[in-house]
């Protein structure tokens, strides 16, 4: 069983006796059902699981379950005598978005207090935007993502002592010993190829076979494209599929942002003409959005009005599969003629999003672009990040100009690359790329008194 950080949260919630039902949201094939199933079977003597996607395609037993009694009746056809055990029973409603009326019903199931409930959803973000009667006070939504780099390290046998050492070195702005650096960088490059989809990671651990890993990734990539075709309106489906298919090629362009006129090859179109399509791709979890900001200040969410957008794949392994297929040299051997900038930016977007950051980039005609801006909670400022895949990692004219703007009040800046040495120069801290695992929102203290 792969270690997932969300496990601790799920266990804590189920044991807390909370009056809210937890829904784990995220893209398909990232391990939601598996982790809930494993936890549920460990914690509860009586475990009941129902998949609403399967039901919708089959008997449609829950299609008309609009009341608590109707739900119990439908559940009894699946659970049978297990419903007699009212105590120590967990009911897992998988793919709850298949029946949006069940989201409304959760409030009343919780109030009836017959069983403990947990749910998961794959296109839940989309459903929540279109369902008006969601009982927000009765549910907690927790987002889940593919394995991040630290989870990948743990899967590959990197122990807690090494993980603690990485965090300690990051905190003190020190370099890792060369031998450990080489090991971590090797695993990071393999992570670029494998990504964080559990099936791909398990295949890597079992066989190390890039061909079978790519087969898994290609199937999931195809599944995401099929999901895009589930949108109710046909004209929206085609545009959603087109935008999704454009993501890899957009990342190969210098600006990397979405070019609106390319979506339908029509002049005069604006970003606002495709709000529903972008919302679908982002809310479903299959793409990650990075919004443009031209005049940053803390908090960044107050400055995100600029109508420019970058989209990244939700898994870097899918991207390297599209770019390089089964050829691993492009990533593992630092081929000088191949620019891995979009690959490195994708893995950083994936990592930061999994850590809970909203993603922004700096775009200014005079100054240029800075890859990422995130909120620096510790200094109540903005933290710029530049991601470098090549050996010229100390060349970053846009970042230099950005730091010269005093009104931005930047307290620190990071450049992440393959280089081993950590150093600070002209207000910029140069870090090994694997230190991205340590860049997380500042955690609240256990007790903060006013």
Positions of predicted regions on the chain:
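Domain-level recognition of nuclease-like catalytic cores that cleave nucleotide substrates
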Residues: 169, 418-450
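Conserved lysine of the Walker
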Residues: 32
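N-terminal pre-Walker A segment at the start of P-loop NTPase domains
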Residues: 1-15
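Hydrophobic positions on the alpha1 helix immediately C-terminal to the Walker A/P-loop
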Residues: 35, 39
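Accessory nucleic acid-recognition modules appended to NTPase machines
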Residues: 202-377
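Short glycine-rich substrate-engagement loop in P-loop NTPases that contacts/grips substrate
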Residues: 54-86
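Structural recognition of the conserved hydrophobic beta-strand(s) that form the central parallel beta-sheet
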Residues: 116-122, 143
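Interdomain motor-coupling "hinge/lid" segment immediately C-terminal to the ATP-binding subdomain
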Residues: 130-252
């Amino acid at each position: 069983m792969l270690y997932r950080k969300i496990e601790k949260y799920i266990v804590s919630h189920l044991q807390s006796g909370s009056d809210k039902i937890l829904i784990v949201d995220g893209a398909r094939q990232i391990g939601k059902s598996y982790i809930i199933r494993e936890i549920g079977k460990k914690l509860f003597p009586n475990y009941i699981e129902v998949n609403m996607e399967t039901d919708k395609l089959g008997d449609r037993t829950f299609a008309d379950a609009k009341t608590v009694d109707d739900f119990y009746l439908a559940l009894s056809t699946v659970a049978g005598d297990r419903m007699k055990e009212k105590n120590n029973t967990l009911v897992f409603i998988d793919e709850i978005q298949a029946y949006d009326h069940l989201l409304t019903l959760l409030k009343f199931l919780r109030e009836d207090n017959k069983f403990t409930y947990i749910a998961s959803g794959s296109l839940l973000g989309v459903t929540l935007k279109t369902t008006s009667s969601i009982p927000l006070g009765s549910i907690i939504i927790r987002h889940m993502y593919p394995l991040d780099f630290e989870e990948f390290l743990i899967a590959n046998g990197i122990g807690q002592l090494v993980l603690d050492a990485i965090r300690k070195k990051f905190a003190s702005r020190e370099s890792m010993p060369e031998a450990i650096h080489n090991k971590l960088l090797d695993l990071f490059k393999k992570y670029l190829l494998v990504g964080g989809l559990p099936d791909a990671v398990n295949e890597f651990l079992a066989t190390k076979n890039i061909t079978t890993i790519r087969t898994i990734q290609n199937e999931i990539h195809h599944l995401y494209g099929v999901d895009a075709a589930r949108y109710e309106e046909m004209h929206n489906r085609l545009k959603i599929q087109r935008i999704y298919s454009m993501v890899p090629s957009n990342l190969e362009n210098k600006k990397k942002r979405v070019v609106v006129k390319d979506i339908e090859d029509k002049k005069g179109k604006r970003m606002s003409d495709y709000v529903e399509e972008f919302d679908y791709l982002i809310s479903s979890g299959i793409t990650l959005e990075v919004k443009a900001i031209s005049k940053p200040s803390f908090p960044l969410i107050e400055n995100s009005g600029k109508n420019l957008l970058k989209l990244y794949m939700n898994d870097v392994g899918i991207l390297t599969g599209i770019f390089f297929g089964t050829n691993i040299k492009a990533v593992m051997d630092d081929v000088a003629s191949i620019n891995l900038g979009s690959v490195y930016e994708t893995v950083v977007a994936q990592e930061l999003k999994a850590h809970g950051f909203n993603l922004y980039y700096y775009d200014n005609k005079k100054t240029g672009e800075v890859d990422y801006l995130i909120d620096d909670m510790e200094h109540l400022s903005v933290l710029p990040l530049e991601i470098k895949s090549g050996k010229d990692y100390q060349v970053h004219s846009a970042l230099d100009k950005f730091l010269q703007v005093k009104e931005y009040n930047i307290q620190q800046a990071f450049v992440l690359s393959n280089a081993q040495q950590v150093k600070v120069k002209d207000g910029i801290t140069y870090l090994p790329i694997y230190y991205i695992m340590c860049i997380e929102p500042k955690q609240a203290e256990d007790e903060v008194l006013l």
